[in-house]
A protein has these predicted regions:
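P-loop/Walker A NTP-binding region and its immediately flanking N-terminal helices
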Residues: 1-130
Length: 130
């Protein structure tokens, strides 16, 4: 696949691609580098104010661990239908490259607490091997 860097948003073009390039407090950077060193991405909840780097860290972890990922912005798609369709289609298949998969739920505080949040536990248990 050929990509044209001229069409990237500036923030995406220059987003750090690995944890070492992220500007983080030392204790957080060390924690994330330990995750990379373990070679296994666990379920994580990253919290903090807007613009502090949560999404960047999630993407950098996936990149360093050669993990295929999909990102869902819950402020736009935070409902049970998204879980049943887009996320299920992604998580239920095995990666062509043989990589593990990760689902990044951005702005999860906007997810519907009555439907999506309770269903997520069973979903994680069902597809944790992928």
């Amino acid at each position: 696949m050929i990509t044209d860097n001229a069409n990237y948003l500036w923030v995406e073009k220059y987003r750090p691609q690995c944890i070492a390039d992220c500007i983080l407090p030392d204790h957080l950077k060390n924690t994330f580098q330990e995750i990379v060193g373990s070679g296994e991405l666990q379920n994580l909840l990253l919290s903090g104010g807007p613009g502090c780097g949560k999404t960047t860290v999630a993407k950098a972890l996936c990149n360093e661990l050669n993990t295929d990922w999909i990102i869902i912005n819950c402020s736009e798609d935070g409902n049970i239908d998204t879980l049943r369709t887009r996320i299920r289609q992604f998580a239920s298949t095995i990666s062509i490259s043989g990589n593990n998969k990760a689902v990044i739920l951005d702005e999860f505080d906007y997810a519907n607490p009555q439907s999506m949040q309770p269903a997520l536990r069973g979903f994680i248990e069902e597809f944790s091997k992928n």
